């Protein structure tokens, strides 16, 4: 399976260049018509990343933040995207990561981390 989104070496380079703390995150997103989960990795603060309506056009809540090495958070993202490929969801309103990182359900392993 090909994992779309941030390429491993690109993310590792970005983490070194920005000097930020790599984080694997899971958020719940919703509005009056939709509810879904979005996972991802970042070296920025999640509140900064999704702090505007343009960046995140849905109501949202952080369910999980796991800071670790760039390699570890990248590998977590790939693992959970693979586990949850059958639950993939494309939200009606587009935002960064909405096409590849949203899901209707969570894997058991991810639920246990929350």
Regions found by a protein language model. Name each.
Residues 1-114:
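Non-catalytic accessory segments flanking enzymatic or RNA/DNA-binding domains
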């Amino acid at each position: 399976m090909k994992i779309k989104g941030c390429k491993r070496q690109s993310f590792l380079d970005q983490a070194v260049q920005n000097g930020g703390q790599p984080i694997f995150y899971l958020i719940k997103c919703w509005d009056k018509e939709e509810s879904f989960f979005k996972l991802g990795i970042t070296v920025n603060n999640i509140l900064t990343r999704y702090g505007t309506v343009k960046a995140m056009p849905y109501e949202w809540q952080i369910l999980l933040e796991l800071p670790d090495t760039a390699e570890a958070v990248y590998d977590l993202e790939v693992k959970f995207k693979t586990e949850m490929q059958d639950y993939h969801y494309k939200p009606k309103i587009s935002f960064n990561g909405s096409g590849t990182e949203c899901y209707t359900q969570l894997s058991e392993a991810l639920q246990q981390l929350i």
